[in-house]
A protein has these predicted regions:
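Conserved active-site beta-strand element of glycosyltransferases/polysaccharide synthases
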Residues: 32
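Glycine/Thr-rich phosphate-binding loops that ligate phosphate moieties of nucleotide
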Residues: 42-275
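Short beta-strand scaffold segments in enzyme catalytic cores
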Residues: 17-20, 38-42, 116
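Conserved phosphate-binding catalytic cores of ATP/NTP-utilizing and phosphoryl-transfer enzymes
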Residues: 1-2, 12-29
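Short pre-catalytic strand/loop immediately N-terminal to key active-site residues, enriched for Gly-Thr
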Residues: 4-9, 201-204
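A short, flexible low-complexity segment enriched in Lys/Arg and Gly/Pro that occurs
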Residues: 10-13, 98
């Protein structure tokens, strides 16, 4: 067994640990991470409950704190789906996702009117609907492969923005937004998120937030710091900030309004096709 006196420290669930590793521990601090799924996670000092089940509320990794989060089922999965079905372009030694986002960067914000609904696996936020379906709307003969890729990047960001819309509805404050996951490695996707959210976004130095968060919690338990707040202030550092572009924010607001009309329209069509 363990030697007598060895500290044993409780950790946290994956999202709470990841948020701790990004410094998302005080009210107003929010993270938006894009992996296979996408998660918008807000730290709170009270349980913020959504009676409709569109957001999920849990205890945080530190006493007296909670977190509320929204989930996009197919965030990074949308881009992976495109890669797997249609390819990532000619091999040139770069990562396939770098090639895809580089292609998308050739297209202006708004993808010339093309919209993507990323509901490839049903959805959780804001539509708690296992039968939600994905859609590409606005396609014309002038659109290219690059337009489709950009519309996917923007559509995922619109889906994550839905969580921020619900936070506002519920009175959950948003003072800072930190990006994480594989999506945060793309300069284009970082800028798209800043423009879609209409808010400066930050990138922290350490990418592996969950492991880093578990290490921070262990350090607090071992008395390296006297609190998780103090530990995050000392150990979590911002590497980059990305500002939204006002003209693009206005354009993204208009696109988001159109995006919000997609789900009910597609749901109405698809419900009539179900056996």
């Amino acid at each position: 067994g363990l030697k007598a006196g060895t500290p044993v420290v409780a950790g946290a669930g994956d999202k709470a640990a990841g948020a701790t590793g990004m410094g998302i521990v005080t009210p107003g601090a929010v993270s938006a991470t894009i992996g296979t799924s996408g998660v918008v996670f807000a730290a709170t000092d009270r349980p913020a409950l959504d009676a409709q089940g569109r957001l999920h509320t849990f205890c945080h990794a530190l006493p007296g704190r909670w977190h509320v989060m929204g989930v996009t089922q197919a965030a990074g999965l949308s881009l992976r789906w495109f890669r797997d079905r249609f390819g990532a372009g000619a091999e040139d030694g770069r990562d396939p996702y770098e090639r895809l986002t580089s292609d998308a960067a050739r297209v202006p914000p708004g993808a010339d009117g093309l919209l993507w609904a990323p509901y490839l696996m049903g959805e959780r936020t804001p539509h708690l609907d296992p039968n939600a379906r994905g859609a590409l709307i606005g396609l014309t003969a002038s659109h290219t492969r690059d337009h489709i890729i950009r519309s996917i990047l923007e559509g995922v960001a619109f889906s994550l923005r839905d969580s921020f819309t619900l936070f506002e509805e519920m009175g959950v404050p948003v003072k800072s937004i930190r990006l994480g996951g594989g999506g945060a490695r793309s300069a284009l996707w970082r800028q798209i998120q800043a423009d879609v959210y209409g808010h400066e976004v930050e990138i922290v130095e350490v990418e592996e937030g969950a492991a880093y968060g578990a290490a921070i919690l262990a350090g607090v338990g071992a008395k390296m710091w006297n609190s998780v707040d103090a530990a995050c202030s000392a150990a979590v550092r911002v590497a980059q900030r990305v500002a939204p572009r006002p003209a693009v924010v206005r354009q993204m607001n208009a696109s988001y309004a159109a995006y919000r009309r997609m789900y009910p329209a597609v749901r109405s069509i698809c419900s009539k096709m179900e056996p």
